[in-house]
Amino acid sequence: MPTLNEIQDYLARSGDDAFRWEYPIHEFEGGWFTWYDDAKVDALIVLQAYGNNRALLKQAKMMARQLHRPRIRFATQHKGAAMARLFGGRVVAEIIDIEV
């Protein structure tokens, strides 16, 4: 499992010149979460979340409500998939959207 610093470094290097990841990344049990806002998506982004465990989903829903995000977007890593990658505001990985 990558460290938080490795993820932040990856996000800093992964976008094009017009894209800068300026939102904080927070660690929690089971992974990390962050968010972004644009015309298409206003979601809590959960990175490195493992499985569909109920406790994780409950915690993510609670955080999404606190952050006033209408959706949770899971970018998951499992079954040997590469680390979830964010490019230009798009999540490139297995994505699961859940309405809060």
Go through each PLM region and give its residues:
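A broad, low-specificity signal for short, low-complexity segments enriched in glycine/proline
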Residues: 6-13, 33-37, 54-59
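Amide-forming acyltransferase catalytic core, primarily the GNAT-like/NAT-type
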Residues: 1-27
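Short glycine/proline-enriched coil/turn segments at helix->beta-strand junctions
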Residues: 23, 27-30, 67-70, 88-92
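Acyl-donor binding region in acyl/amide transferases
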Residues: 41-88
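Conserved donor-binding loop and adjoining core beta-sheet/short helix segment
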Residues: 19-55
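Terminal substrate-recognition subdomain of acyl/acetyltransferases
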Residues: 2-10, 36-40, 75-100
